[in-house]
């Protein structure tokens, strides 16, 4: 199934890079195919750009920076709000593109379009609130203060699991601040990024302000990191790659924002109803087929309700439908490619070899080679991969704990620190866990925790900086201090 025969607006299906307001082939004619993970069929091709073309994107952004930063904040706001309106108006086509290239169920894709668009609206308005400060002067006859200025060109390297929202969350903040952007989307999911470029052009965003480059990830990323004209780099992806990009950006001393891996604990207190908690845990685990940095990775249940919780979890998990994301009533789509399936299988095999119990998860029922059936393991322990690694698959590992002190130690036993979930109605337990958990975000009695007002980000090896909220735009702003001296006395006659 091709994208073009599924869309009401065929112009949203672009198979070229977008640089300086122009749709661009690769100079050497190199291409790579993009596949539907549900069927394995190619849905299109994209160019592999040459080095000089990537540098040309930086040239375009550099030229556009002069004009874009000179606009008033309310003028940039108007263009971003026009972009927001177009995202909403084209939600169905954008969702279809996303499902075909990424695999997630169509309702989830629609939700991502809404979620991604909401950041455009949020930052369009936040750009008008980049206030400076007035500083009480310690210098006679002087006025002191600060102003906020755009940092410069921002390079945005985005993942395949949320191919639209991870772009808008970064790009809207940067553009609202006055910074042009160069987007490098994941090669598995380029078409969402290119559709965003088409709509940005329609919204009146000037040429060179929003660019999309395509090519071999390591080569393009290295070029962007090495170019001193790029002043900010924002990356969402694995901790391993994030460390590499941080190292590569050191020579040019870039402003670096990293949203990296997660290994979220889901803690269930002894006072919880097992059914309520289990249903919430299933939702936290299996969104996007587990391919989510916020997915519950280690489910830690008090020993007094462990068995009842496992029973309810297995029952709810069994009701999930796995299939092509374009089909109705599908809860889980495919994994992104065969390597992801192989990794999921290896994680399960490792756990079983180390003593875990397979409660459910018959892979013979998978509807295709890129699918992985929801899997439940109990008795998981710290030496297992399912405990130590971000599995990015529909594999749930459950274990029990005795008391709050033990579960805090278990939850913090990881290099990651992005998000944690706590389910309990005991206010003292809530406060104790909230303070003791080493995570950038803690959600209590709610699976949903993110959105435009939220400062999204982690601690430890889960990243640097925050996206969203009132501080998200600061990733793309410099604070300039001024001292106005020799102003004379302001005392009256």
Swiss-Prot record:
Keywords: Cytoplasm, NAD, NADP, Oxidoreductase. It is found in: Cytoplasm. Disruption phenotype: Cells lacking this gene are unable to grow on ectoine as sole carbon source. SUPFAM superfamilies: ALDH-like (SSF53720). InterPro entries: Ald_DH/histidinol_DH, Ald_DH_C, Ald_DH_CS_CYS, Ald_DH_CS_GLU, Ald_DH_N, Aldehyde_DH_dom, Aldehyde_DH_Superfamily. One of its GO terms (molecular function) is oxidoreductase activity, acting on the aldehyde or oxo group of donors, NAD or NADP as acceptor. NADP(+) binds at residues 160-161, 184-187, 237-238, 260, 390. The keyword NADP applies. Coiled coil: none annotated. The active site is at residues 259, 293. It is an enzyme of class 1 (oxidoreductase). Gene3D superfamilies: Aldehyde Dehydrogenase, Chain A, domain 1 (3.40.605.10), Aldehyde Dehydrogenase, Chain A, domain 2 (3.40.309.10). Belongs to the aldehyde dehydrogenase family. Involved in the degradation of ectoine, which allows H.elongata to utilize ectoine as both a carbon and a nitrogen source for growth. Probably catalyzes the NAD(+)-dependent oxidation of L-aspartate-semialdehyde to L-aspartate. This is Aspartate-semialdehyde dehydrogenase (Non-phosphorylating). It comes from Halomonas elongata (strain ATCC 33173 / DSM 2581 / NBRC 15536 / NCIMB 2198 / 1H9).
């Amino acid at each position: 199934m091709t994208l073009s025969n599924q869309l009401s607006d065929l112009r949203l299906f672009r198979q070229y890079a977008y640089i300086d307001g122009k749709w661009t082939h690769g100079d050497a004619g190199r291409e790579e195919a993009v596949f539907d993970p549900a069927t394995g069929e190619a849905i299109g091709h994209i160019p592999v750009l040459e080095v000089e073309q990537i540098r040309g994107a930086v040239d375009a952004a550099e030229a556009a920076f002069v004009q874009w930063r000179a606009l008033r904040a309310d003028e940039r706001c108007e263009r971003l709000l026009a972009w927001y309106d177009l995202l909403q108006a084209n939600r169905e086509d954008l969702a279809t593109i996303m499902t075909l290239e990424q695999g997630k169920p169509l309702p989830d894709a629609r939700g991502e379009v809404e979620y991604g668009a909401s950041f455009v609206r949020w930052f369009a308005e936040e750009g008008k609130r980049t206030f400076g400060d007035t500083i009480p002067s310690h210098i006679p006859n002087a006025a002191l203060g600060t102003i906020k200025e755009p940092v410069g060109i921002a390079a945005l390297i985005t993942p395949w699991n949320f191919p639209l929202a991870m772009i808008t969350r970064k790009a809207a903040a940067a553009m609202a601040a006055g910074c042009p952007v160069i987007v490098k989307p994941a090669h598995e999911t380029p078409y969402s990024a290119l559709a965003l470029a088409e709509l940005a052009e329609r919204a009146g965003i000037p040429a060179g302000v929003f660019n999309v480059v395509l090519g071999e990830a390591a080569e393009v990323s290295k070029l962007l990191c090495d170019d001193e004209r790029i002043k900010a780099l924002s990356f969402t992806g694995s901790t391993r790659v994030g460390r590499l990009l941080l190292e590569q950006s050191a020579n040019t001393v870039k402003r670096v924002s990293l949203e990296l891996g997660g290994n979220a604990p889901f803690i269930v207190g002894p006072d919880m109803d097992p059914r309520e908690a289990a249903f919430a845990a299933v939702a936290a685990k299996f969104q996007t087929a587990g391919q989510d940095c916020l997915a519950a990775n280690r489910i830690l249940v008090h020993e007094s309700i462990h068995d009842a919780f496992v029973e309810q979890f297995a029952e709810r998990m069994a009701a999930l439908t796995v299939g092509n994301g374009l089909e109705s009533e599908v809860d889980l789509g495919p994994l992104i490619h065969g390597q992801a399936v192989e990794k999921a299988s290896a994680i399960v095999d490792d756990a079983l070899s180390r003593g875990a119990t397979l409660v459910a998860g018959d892979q013979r029922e998978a509807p295709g080679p890129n699918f992985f059936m929801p899997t439940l393991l109990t008795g998981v322990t710290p030496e297992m991969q399912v405990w130590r690694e971000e599995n990015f698959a529909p594999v749930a590992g459950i274990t029990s704990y005795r008391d709050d002190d033990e579960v805090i130690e278990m939850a913090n036993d990881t290099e990651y620190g992005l998000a944690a979930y706590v389910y309990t109605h005991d206010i003292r337990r809530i406060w104790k866990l909230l303070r003791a958990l080493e995570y950038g975000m803690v959600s209590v009695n709610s699976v949903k925790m993110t959105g435009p007002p939220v400062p999204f980000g982690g601690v430890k090896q889960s990243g640097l900086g925050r996206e969203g909220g009132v501080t998200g735009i600061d990733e793309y702003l410099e604070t300039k201090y001024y001292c106005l001296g020799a102003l004379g006395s302001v005392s009256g006659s």
